[in-house]
C-alpha cells in the first residue's frame, strides 16, 4: 500500500528520544517531510492515486502510463497518459459502469490505503507515525473535490488543451476527475464521441469543464464535496488509533472508528468503520449507506483478522459483506440488487517468512479496493 509501512518503521528507528512527547513530535514531523518528498515519486500517494486509475483500464486491457514514474516534482498537473481515444470510446460505450468508476478510482485508492494503514496500526500495535499521511491524503481529496466545480478549472483545462496540442499520447485520460465523473453519472448513455473535436483539431475533446456541466450536476458535485469532510471524523487522525474500552483479568479491550465518504459508480458510500480488539480476537465491522441520486441502499460488513492457530504459526483472516446496491450500478434507479462478498486469507510462519494464500469471491456490485464490478473469484 504505497510507502506507508517501510517509511514509518524507518522513521521510528531514527527519531527515538527520551521524551515521549518529543519522540512523537519528531516522528510525525519526519514522516510529514518524507510524505511530501515522496508525493511525486513512485510508490508515493500521487503514484498510488494514478495506479488505481490504471487498474480499472488494465482490467479492460487498456494500456496507459503513470507520469509519477518520471518524478514530476512541483508539477501542478500529473497525468495518466498514452491512452488512445479508441480505447476510451470502447470503455465508455461498452463498459459504462467501469468508465464511471475509472474517474474516481484514484480517490478510492487513497481512502483504501488509509483504511488499510489504520487497520494495521490498530490490530498489529504498530504505533507508526501515519497522521501526516492521513491528513495529506484526506485533505488533497477534499480540496480537489470541492474545487472541481469552480470556474478556475475552466481556465486550467483550456491551458492544458493548448499545451498538449495535437499530441494525443501526451493527454491525460480524463482531465479533472470529478467533473467527468459527475457528467457521466447524469448522462450515462451519452456517446463518448459527443464530446466533440479537441481544440487542436486532432482527436476527441476529453476534458469536461465545470461550465459544461448541467446545473443539477454541478449542485450534486458541490454536495459531494461537502460530504467529503466526513472523512476527517476519526480518532486515528488526531493520534488515537486505539481507545481502551475496559480491562479485565483476561486482558484489555480496545476500540476505534472512522467515518468515510467514498465516491462510487452509482453515487456514494457513506460508511462507519468499527475497529474492535479483545485479548484473543481482532474484529472489524462496517455499516454502509449506499446512495444514488434519489435512493438509499444498505450493507453490512464483518471480518475476523489474524486469528492465531497452531501455536500461533498459522494466521487466519476472514471477511464477509452483504448489501443492497442500485440495480446495474445505476445513478437513477430505486430498484435494489442484493449482493455479497466473502474472502479468506491464511498465512503460515516459516522463520521470518509468512507465505500466504488468499481467495475472494463476490457477486455483482461495488466493493472498495476490488477492481471487479461484476461477479468474480480472485486468488
PLM features: residue spans?
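Auxiliary, metal-adjacent structural segments of Zn-dependent hydrolase domains
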Residues: 1-44, 62-73
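Hydrophobic alpha-helical membrane-anchor/signal-helix detector
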Residues: 20-59, 99-125, 131-147, 226-242
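Small-residue-rich helix-interface/hinge motifs
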Residues: 34-94
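Metalloprotease/metallohydrolase-associated module, dominated by Zn2+-dependent proteases
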Residues: 79-183
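C-terminal membrane-associated helical module and adjoining short loops/tails
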Residues: 143-277
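Residues that define the transmembrane beta-barrel architecture of outer-membrane proteins
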Residues: 234-239, 264-270, 294-300, 332-342, ...
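Transmembrane beta-strand segments that form the barrel wall of outer-membrane beta-barrel proteins
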Residues: 250-263, 280-293, 314-326, 352-362
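Outer-membrane beta-barrel "beta-signal"
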Residues: 272-274, 303, 344, 365-379
Amino acid at each position: 500500500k504505497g510507502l506507508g509501512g517501510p517509511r514509518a518503521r524507518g522513521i521510528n528507528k531514527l527519531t527515538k528520544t527520551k521524551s515521549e512527547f518529543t519522540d512523537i513530535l519528531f516522528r510525525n514531523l519526519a514522516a510529514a517531510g518524507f510524505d511530501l518528498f515522496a508525493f511525486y515519486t513512485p510508490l508515493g500517494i500521487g503514484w498510488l492515486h494514478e495506479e488505481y486509475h490504471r487498474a480499472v483500464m488494465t482490467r479492460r486491457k487498456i494500456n496507459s502510463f503513470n507520469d509519477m514514474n518520471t518524478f514530476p516534482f512541483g508539477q501542478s498537473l500529473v497525468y495518466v497518459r498514452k491512452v488512445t481515444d479508441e480505447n476510451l470510446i470502447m470503455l465508455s460505450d461498452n463498459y459504462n459502469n467501469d468508465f464511471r468508476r475509472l474517474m474516481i478510482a484514484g480517490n478510492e485508492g487513497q481512502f483504501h490505503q488509509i483504511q488499510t494503514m489504520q487497520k494495521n496500526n490498530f490490530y498489529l500495535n504498530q504505533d507508526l507515525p501515519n497522521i501526516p499521511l492521513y491528513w495529506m491524503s484526506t485533505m488533497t481529496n477534499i480540496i480537489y473535490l470541492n474545487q472541481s466545480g469552480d470556474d478556475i478549472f475552466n481556465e486550467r483545462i483550456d491551458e492544458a488543451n493548448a499545451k498538449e496540442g495535437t499530441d494525443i499520447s501526451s493527454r491525460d485520460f480524463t482531465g479533472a476527475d470529478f467533473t467527468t465523473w459527475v457528467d457521466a453519472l447524469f448522462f450515462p448513455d451519452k456517446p463518448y464521441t459527443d464530446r466533440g473535436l479537441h481544440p487542436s483539431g486532432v482527436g476527441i475533446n476529453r476534458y469536461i469543464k465545470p461550465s459544461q456541466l448541467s446545473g443539477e450536476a454541478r449542485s450534486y458535485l458541490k454536495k459531494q464535496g461537502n460530504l467529503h469532510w466526513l472523512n476527517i471524523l476519526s480518532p486515528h487522525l488526531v493520534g488515537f488509533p486505539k481507545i481502551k474500552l475496559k480491562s479485565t483479568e483476561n486482558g484489555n479491550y480496545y476500540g476505534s472508528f472512522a467515518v468515510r465518504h467514498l465516491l462510487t459508480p452509482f453515487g456514494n458510500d457513506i460508511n462507519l468503520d468499527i475497529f474492535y480488539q479483545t485479548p484473543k480476537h481482532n474484529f472489524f465491522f462496517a455499516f454502509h449507506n449506499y446512495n444514488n441520486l434519489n435512493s438509499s441502499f444498505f450493507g453490512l460488513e464483518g471480518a475476523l483478522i489474524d486469528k492465531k492457530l497452531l501455536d500461533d504459526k498459522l494466521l487466519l483472516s476472514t471477511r464477509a459483506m452483504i448489501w443492497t446496491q442500485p440495480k446495474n450500478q445505476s445513478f437513477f434507479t430505486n430498484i435494489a440488487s442484493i449482493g455479497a462478498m466473502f474472502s479468506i486469507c491464511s498465512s503460515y510462519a516459516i522463520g521470518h517468512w509468512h507465505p500466504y494464500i488468499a481467495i475472494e469471491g463476490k457477486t455483482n456490485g461495488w466493493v472498495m479496493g476490488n477492481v471487479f464490478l461484476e461477479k468474480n473469484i480472485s486468488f
